[in-house]
């Protein structure tokens, strides 16, 4: 695998591409971590630290991206302090939504690195290509079958992790012909409860999952047709930070894509896709000591399509047009079984539907003096409705006048300028405006228990769209052996959606301290910085370092929840012939700006060290690769600020992997 790291100076911090024996630096408009068939790339070993790493591990090392951790599995992406409905997460351009009211199943858990070709990240309001957003976007691009290659290629590997007695099996294969190709991959993971830095077992941290993907690609003259199928199923997934675990989490994805590459003077390429995905999630408390057993299933089904075209309209203008539509249906239920009475039923997400149609246009303009400007805009029309019946009747208790159907328009407009100055510097500036829709949970949620602040949450169908005004400034320096980039950003969010205590309402969950209701507050603000460094002083030595941090508060000066501390990761790598070694230093500053209103506590800083090594060799059958390492070398007891419930991170972990390629 080769990982190419492109960082938008305005929105992230650097872009680096390693060629066969030299570093080439470009500055583009997004972060991309891209997989191709090689093991010789510096950044692969930074982002995907070992072959047992999952998608969440890779995301956590990207600048501007963080994770809310409730377990060893099912971690929720955060972009510059924004998460949930504030950001867009797509799988190969497909809209997809989790089915858990407790956010145990962000859609990123349903894909594995072996499924992926690339991860694209755009930060802030500039990430609106695939949907209106205020916080940014992540698009996980699926790997494609490769045509015109050796007829059959593939790999198989096994990994082991001592901290959780975890096993990871993976395999993929590509069958190639001149006009067609087929790809299949399979992954199996199983981990027991892990131990923290004090040697104590973190109960309910186990998980098991399987992942299968199939893809076909056919060349028809200048056209390409692709078909994708992916199914991912997790079982017996523990969540130590929550009062319930997950019995089953299953997602299925289907897609058919048409691509046309032309020699036309004006139309460069056209891509159209139709897709569907289904998510089922079943919470489980059968292994917990509870006062009352509950069944809590959830469903989320999405169907959609898009068309995307790039047009060379004028000599110095490249236009992108995209139109898309999706329809989502979500439902979550709860059945309670009191020990001394009849069962009780409620809908924690009342059955609701959302249809969104949008259009996006961008103009990339080349101006004299190597100045490059990108202007983009998006308009979405959304129709959200709640189904007549039980779920709607629940909300009538609180909102007797609310409308069954909510219609809203969301808008975004962004401008970015990039200017090389002197010989080795690049300046970038971005200003933008964006809006986002309230989520179905924020609109219709019914007594959703939040373990972090011990409150029940109720939605508000009268919410307005949340807005954001954003600006970024970046500066970069590069030469043959050094790349240094820094970015500062600021966002002002009017009508920020936040939940506040309603003292007029009584909690339903036993032990809950009260009820919170979502509302629009006047505003909130976010600011922070990101920094990256890549040094290659010698052919065999590379140093990579990333630093990122965000601060956020309301207009009243109250800290916002889920804001990470400043974090750094530094990696020093040595390669010689068939051997490599890598030393990493990871750490974070203390977070003393915690949101006590949302159950947060100040978090101390930490530093940990990781040591990795690898060796590869060839024989007539193919290539063998061996790797081993020690993570958290000093067995440090620590946690990060976004780790719910004070649950500690794993202690010292010895891992090893063996892989064969043919």
Residue positions per predicted region:
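Outer membrane beta-barrel strand-and-loop segments of large Gram-negative receptors
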Residues: 215, 298-309, 348, 352-358, ...
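Gram-negative outer-membrane beta-barrel transporters
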Residues: 367-369, 373, 381-382, 489-493, ...
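Short, acidic, small-residue-rich periplasmic hinge/interaction motif at the N-terminus
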Residues: 20-49, 54-56, 84
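Structural signature of Gram-negative outer-membrane beta-barrels, strongest in the C-terminal barrel
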Residues: 316, 324, 350-493, 536-539, ...
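N-terminal periplasmic accessory domains that precede
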Residues: 51-59, 75-78, 90, 106-111, ...
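C-terminal beta-signal and adjacent terminal beta-strands/loops
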Residues: 492-495, 499, 543, 589-594, ...
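Short acidic/polar hinge/loop motifs at secondary-structure boundaries
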Residues: 95-124
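Flexible loop and strand-edge segments within Gram-negative outer membrane beta-barrel domains
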Residues: 191-193, 203-209, 221-270, 275-302, ...
